[in-house]
Amino acid sequence: MLSSFPVVLLETMSHYTDEPRFTIEQIDLLQRLRRTGMTKHEILHALETLDRLDQEHSDKFGRRSSYGGSSYGNSTNNVPASSSTATASTQTQHSGMSPSPSNSYDTSPLPCTTNQNGRENNDRLSTSNGKMSPSRYHANSMGQRSYSFEASEEDLDVDDKVEELMRRDSSVIKEEIKAFLANRRISQAVVAQVTGISQSRISHWLLQQGSDLSEQKKRAFYRWYQLEKTNPGATLSMRPAPIPIEDPEWRQTPPPVSATPGTFRLRRGSRFTWRKECLAVMESYFNENQYPDEAKREEIANACNAVIQKPGKKLSDLERVTSLKVYNWFANRRKEIKRRANIAAILESHGIDVQSPGGHSNSDDVDGNDYSEQDDSTSHSDHQDPISLAVEMAAVNHTILALARQGANEIKTEALDDD
């Protein structure tokens, strides 16, 4: 690829004592520039014109060094000036570029930016003595416009629609989204994979159950909805950016806000691994009641934290058991029992004898919770002693809490009797 460099590059850099080194991007841009049909003298003339414009506007816009730095400035001084005229064939090779009748330079800046409609202002030129001189639009932006600027108008339109959805009644939008998913046959697992929102949160939100989604997650969900409606299947190849946005109980620091429209910056939360001591406590409570209420879940969480709490050390947010984690564990436990019961029914229908579908589960819940499977072997070794101890401690903790509530009620009753 180096052998195909234009001769102008070798002449320009001949004063270097060492062989110049170029990046792949620079080589690609030089090749693109040469393929536009510009000659060596036209390229040098354009670069000299840009240098002169930078010098004239340095007081107003500051000195710029975006054309190769100081090394370029030294190299262009050693190159003779090009021809004073530009051929008509060269002028016609630049679409949208026509020479200005003015003999003076345009003193207004010519930035390489996009307007609100996503179109580049690449049709503005500064001329000298009726000759065309390329504007301050260099090859670097030519390589970028094909993939970074064309979607700006669509992004703005999607943002407007997302804001409109945020202002509408969420219950109506949920019905629309459910119908959309059913008609397109899009599973909630696919939506969860693209947006980074857990499947259970999506399911509960669409079914009007549980807490509402946060504003940022709701915007990400609505953005996916609008993009999928506009371009069916386009979002299926998207993946969330690697910036974690987790549930409020799991969050330790405020999440960063995405500044780039059209990107999803949501990801599933970290996985929580249940310790054996906590599993023993959970199993004991599960055997008593498979559907604990909020107060009971708080009690179970406190019992688990008391078991794993080490003296003089505070549990971190990742280690601490919360009522939400208890809720997910119980839901997964019931789901696993039901799944095993269904499997057992299928096997029995084929005349295969199976054991009770009970037992322990090691399946992951849809929110990313993970707990270890208990050892169902008949051997009872010393490593099970901590579990037995955990069960006893949980029972003691449960008794203490019950006595504390009973004692408080008795104190209130005695106070009323004294009055």
From Swiss-Prot:
Disordered: annotated segments: 56-152, 352-384
InterPro entries: Cro/C1-type_HTH (IPR001387), HD (IPR001356), HMBOX1 (IPR040363), HNF-1_N (IPR006899), HNF-1_POU (IPR044869), HNF_P1 (IPR044866), Homeodomain-like_sf (IPR009057), Lambda_DNA-bd_dom_sf (IPR010982)
Domain POU-specific atypical: 145-241
Annotated site (Critical for recognition and binding of 5'-TTAGGG-3' motifs in telomeric DNA): K335
Glycyl lysine isopeptide (Lys-Gly) (interchain with G-Cter in SUMO2) crosslink location in chain: K60, K131, K161, K174, K217, K310, K412
Residues of the HNF-p1 domain: 18-49
GO terms of biological process kind: negative regulation of DNA-templated transcription; positive regulation of DNA-templated transcription; telomere maintenance via telomerase
Residues modified to Phosphoserine: S148, S170
UniProt GO molecular function: double-stranded telomeric DNA binding; protein-containing complex binding; telomeric DNA binding
Comment field on protein domains: The homeobox domain is required for binding to 5'-TTAGGG-3' repeats in telomeres, and for telomere localization.
PANTHER family: HOMEOBOX-CONTAINING PROTEIN 1, HOMEODOX-CONTAINING PROTEIN 1 HMBOX1
Name under which the protein is recorded: Homeobox-containing protein 1
Gene name per UniProt: Hmbox1
